[in-house]
């Protein structure tokens, strides 16, 4: 490896950590301000009714779920809709960290069903101009990725 390649790899890893932290910050803020829609079906309903209010779509999946054909079909349809409506999309791994961020119980004791965290939408109503540092950082990362022909960028949320 050349020095330039080593620096590029180091910069990419640094950027990934920065964007990952921005996504975490954004999700917590969006949930606190009731700007987060959770679940594949709930997200599809919202995008059908008011796609202009959606500013970011997170598609979350871990490696062991990659073979779930139904989920992949849902993701393909959601990605298509997001591209058509100029909604930023990010693929995310680290479902356990995602659940932790959103305050999901560690174990469901059979009393409550865990929420579907595979699709998350961050909304920004037309009457409000909410700008969070996390949203700006993630939007910038998405734009930069599209410039590199990576239409659906990927980040990994790290366990803590």
Curated annotation (Swiss-Prot):
Coiled coil, from the record: none
InterPro entries, alphabetized: GADD45, Ribosomal_eL30-like_sf, Ribosomal_eL8/eL30/eS12/Gad45
Gene3D superfamilies, per the entry: 3.30.1330.30
Alphabetical UniProt keywords: Apoptosis, Developmental protein, Differentiation
Source taxon at top rank: Eukaryota
Assembly and interaction partners: Interacts with GADD45GIP1.
Biological function: Involved in the regulation of growth and apoptosis. Mediates activation of stress-responsive MTK1/MEKK4 MAPKKK.
Record-given protein name: Growth arrest and DNA damage-inducible protein GADD45 beta
Species whose genome carries this gene: Bos taurus (Bovine)
